[in-house]
């Protein structure tokens, strides 16, 4: 309780005060024991995810920043006390903590061992996969610096392409870089493939990428992006914003998929959900002429199949 009283003031956590005191006054074993206690506190979730090979969660939900700081602190402390032989065990046990990965890569770069650094970067990125929820972004950028020094333009383009497709990343700077690097005569085909190879889309990503597609006048790419994001609460608003850039065929394809989703929803929906379904029907009705016609046909279908649901019929008529 006394320790909590210190923590509640938010000036400094007592563990940090205790560690600072031990760092100055305690012998090495006492200080390391204190560090190990803190490391253990942050270790359980990390080891569980590594054992289950849940690296998507390891990089997106649990960044383990505090664990990483403590491990680097321990490694540096061991070195200053001539106990470098103990650090290999730490590096192996916690080799997937992002800070530990970066520590190894940065050391190799500081020593001028670029080939070894590239191998370490590739090995680390491979663990998390191309789409590293931003965890792999700094390693891709380090790799780009090395490749640029070697004038390896093709692989620089490939790294920027991999960065563009990442989840939760600002894609705009990477599109601009790619536009500078890719030959003008190859750009049209390249950018169409680029827009078609984005594995995860959020609402923000959807808006950003759709705006890029419109700027590049590659309107045929809009359908896939909107389809990938069609379970979003904002799907109708987004379709309405970009529908007029799409071909009538693509407008119809998107509308039919939304109608199919609504049809499935209606098959099990309770009365409290009717308002949301009817709101989507009304929204799709106003998006474009193609969706308007298809929605009118769907409303007739709903009236025929669910005419015995007065609450739903009342909302539709209103």
Task: State where each predicted segment sits.
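Eukaryote-biased, non-catalytic alpha-solenoid scaffold regions
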Residues: 1-318
């Amino acid at each position: 309780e006394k320790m909590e009283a210190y923590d509640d003031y938010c000036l400094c956590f007592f563990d940090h005060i205790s560690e600072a005191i031990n760092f100055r006054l305690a012998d090495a074993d006492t200080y390391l024991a204190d560090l190990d206690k803190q490391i253990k506190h942050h270790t359980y979730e990390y080891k569980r995810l590594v054992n289950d090979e849940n690296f998507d969660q390891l990089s997106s939900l649990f960044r383990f920043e505090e664990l990483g700081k403590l491990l680097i602190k321990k490694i540096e402390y061991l070195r200053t006390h001539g106990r470098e032989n103990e650090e290999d065990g730490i590096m192996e046990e916690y080799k997937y903590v992002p800070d530990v990965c970066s520590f190894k890569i940065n050391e190799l770069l500081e020593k001028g061992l670029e080939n070894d650094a590239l191998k370490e970067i590739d090995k680390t990125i491979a663990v998390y996969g191309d789409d590293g929820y931003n965890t792999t972004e700094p390693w891709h950028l380090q790799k780009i610096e090395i490749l640029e020094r070697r004038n390896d333009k093709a692989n620089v383009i490939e790294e920027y392409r991999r960065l563009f497709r990442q989840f939760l990343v600002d894609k705009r700077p990477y599109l601009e870089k790619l536009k500078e690097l890719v030959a003008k005569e190859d750009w049209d085909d390249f950018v169409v493939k680029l827009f078609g190879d984005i594995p995860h889309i959020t609402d923000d990503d959807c808006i950003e990428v759709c705006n890029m597609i419109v700027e590049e006048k590659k309107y045929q790419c809009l359908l896939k992006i909107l389809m990938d994001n069609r379970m979003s609460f904002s799907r109708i608003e987004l379709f309405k914003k970009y529908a007029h850039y799409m071909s009538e065929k693509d407008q119809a394809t998107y509308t039919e998929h939304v109608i199919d989703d609504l049809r499935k929803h209606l098959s099990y929906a309770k009365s409290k959900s009717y308002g949301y379904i009817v709101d989507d029907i009304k929204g799709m009705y106003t998006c474009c002429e193609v969706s308007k016609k298809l929605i009118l046909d769907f409303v007739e279908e709903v009236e025929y199949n669910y005419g015995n649901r007065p609450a739903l019929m009342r909302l539709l008529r209103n």
